[in-house]
């Protein structure tokens, strides 16, 4: 059964004839620049952060963990559906080499061999954390609002929690375990520890 699933996934991947690499890492560490450089090669596609990992997580939670479906489990079908997210998401791309970008790959490394039957190849751009925090603060000072006119997500969280808008508080929030930098560092450490 397990081998049959792997064969179906292999066939689907070869049908679309694509090679997949994954990009994660720390925020404001050059992944957008790296994507632009990779895209100069006509055989490569590296877009903005994709919803592939969050979609797989949501499907896994729904198909494998939802009480409504546990009475009639279909693990093989669930695995095939989850495994189809990556190739289907990029089925419109003609390039044979795809770089899927999402910081969550570092905490879901097991998805790559588990669902796609390929060895994980994850590019993780990194940068000194002080430089990352400085970059965030500079970005906020240049433009405190998001594209849609709302206040930036960092200040929004501080205001919601009645915390003064200071650079120290912004940095503390970003580096906290719940912050974008803290989560990314933790994910990267987890991926490195698990090999």
Give, region by region, the residue ranges found by the protein language model:
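A general structural motif
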Residues: 18, 94-96, 119-120
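PAPS-dependent sulfotransferase catalytic domain
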Residues: 103-195
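PAPS-dependent sulfotransferase catalytic core
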Residues: 1-92, 153
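Short beta-strand segments
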Residues: 23-25, 98-101, 124-126
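Short, well-ordered coil/turn elements that cap or connect secondary structure elements
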Residues: 39-41, 94, 117, 194
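Short, flexible loop segments at the rims of nucleotide/cofactor-binding pockets, characterized by
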Residues: 72-78, 98-102, 177-180
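Glycine-rich phosphate-binding loop used to anchor ATP phosphates in small-molecule kinases
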Residues: 85-111
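Short, contiguous strand/loop micro-motifs
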Residues: 21-22, 96, 174-176
